[in-house]
């Protein structure tokens, strides 16, 4: 990894482009692996309710390691942390390729992802600052969503052809991410010399949680992003069961195409947010959050492919516009109070706790036999109400 002692505030710097390239390949692998592993579960006749369990073991790793990964990201050069994390993802994908239990392999990928996330977002605040950070987040989200778009489709299409080939492609993507990490400049550790005593680390993490929760802006950001990503991952699994029921299509590729429409929309929404929203005008994103739930409700009632594509694209546009400013707000305020790595680790705890809760409720709803269309309607309505309540709460705190 190359040595560097200076940060470059341009969002088009060589260091930033290396981060974006590594993120693209890592996210490509994450999304292709999800759909390839779902295809593997289907081929091995696992029950439908086990599908969200796969994601639950992934997010469980985030929650379990949340007290530690923020300090890891702030105690070492973040580029090296990203490289180590991608190596863990590579190991997990390779283990599934070689026939190990897919839930165990996917848990390894989850551990790698847990370590990766605080570093990948925390490094943005070290490479650029101020309102450029919103633009850098937009670039990161656009890269991530492009990877979701291509990775999801690649995972589904390759799995329809050959499941093992799809899994190998995922492992190669992670290997490419490790190589890209080598070109990220080595920046000084943000907070070196912290205690590695486990009890102190847990106490320090929960002190960071309390600090961020007591601040009105960071509390608002934490709740908003947690609701968004919890809903987003649940929508992914909802589509897997919704497609054969509503559209009568039973392949692996169609749900990935529909997920790709959301990804395309998020790229557009993230770009719009970077241009129209600053750290001082974050509240502009809230109407978009409410509309996400409304459009999900309308989408659940569709029975044709074309309107489904259009509505999912709109959901993505609204989602990108909603989440990018909230991410930037948390990074900027969190960097000044508890460190960027710890701020993102706390955010991950909130987001993944929301994912675990929503996926658990979704899995339970499927297990007890609630029709998938009814699940979608209830899910959309509750999300719209939750974001509306958050907006009212935030305005009363001002």
UniProtKB/Swiss-Prot annotation:
<dbReference type="GO" id="GO:0051978">
    <property type="term" value="F:lysophospholipid:sodium symporter activity"/>
</dbReference>
<comment type="similarity">
    <text>Belongs to the major facilitator superfamily. LplT (TC 2.A.1.42) family.</text>
</comment>
<dbReference type="GO" id="GO:0005886">
    <property type="term" value="C:plasma membrane"/>
</dbReference>
<feature type="transmembrane region" description="Helical">
    <location>
        <begin position="53"/>
        <end position="73"/>
    </location>
</feature>
<feature type="transmembrane region" description="Helical">
    <location>
        <begin position="91"/>
        <end position="111"/>
    </location>
</feature>
<dbReference type="InterPro" id="IPR036259">
    <property type="entry name" value="MFS_trans_sf"/>
</dbReference>
<comment type="function">
    <text>Catalyzes the facilitated diffusion of 2-acyl-glycero-3-phosphoethanolamine (2-acyl-GPE) into the cell.</text>
</comment>
<keyword id="KW-1133">Transmembrane helix</keyword>
<keyword id="KW-0812">Transmembrane</keyword>
<keyword id="KW-0997">Cell inner membrane</keyword>
<dbReference type="Pfam" id="PF07690">
    <property type="entry name" value="MFS_1"/>
</dbReference>
<feature type="transmembrane region" description="Helical">
    <location>
        <begin position="164"/>
        <end position="184"/>
    </location>
</feature>
<feature type="transmembrane region" description="Helical">
    <location>
        <begin position="139"/>
        <end position="159"/>
    </location>
</feature>
<keyword id="KW-1003">Cell membrane</keyword>
<keyword id="KW-0472">Membrane</keyword>
<keyword id="KW-0813">Transport</keyword>
<keyword id="KW-0445">Lipid transport</keyword>
<feature type="transmembrane region" description="Helical">
    <location>
        <begin position="281"/>
        <end position="301"/>
    </location>
</feature>
<feature type="transmembrane region" description="Helical">
    <location>
        <begin position="19"/>
        <end position="39"/>
    </location>
</feature>
<protein>
    <recommendedName>
        <fullName>Lysophospholipid transporter LplT</fullName>
    </recommendedName>
</protein>
<feature type="transmembrane region" description="Helical">
    <location>
        <begin position="227"/>
        <end position="247"/>
    </location>
</feature>
<feature type="transmembrane region" description="Helical">
    <location>
        <begin position="304"/>
        <end position="324"/>
    </location>
</feature>
<dbReference type="InterPro" id="IPR023727">
    <property type="entry name" value="LysoPLipid__transptr_LplT"/>
</dbReference>
<dbReference type="InterPro" id="IPR011701">
    <property type="entry name" value="MFS"/>
</dbReference>
<feature type="transmembrane region" description="Helical">
    <location>
        <begin position="257"/>
        <end position="277"/>
    </location>
</feature>
<feature type="transmembrane region" description="Helical">
    <location>
        <begin position="372"/>
        <end position="392"/>
    </location>
</feature>
<feature type="transmembrane region" description="Helical">
    <location>
        <begin position="350"/>
        <end position="370"/>
    </location>
</feature>
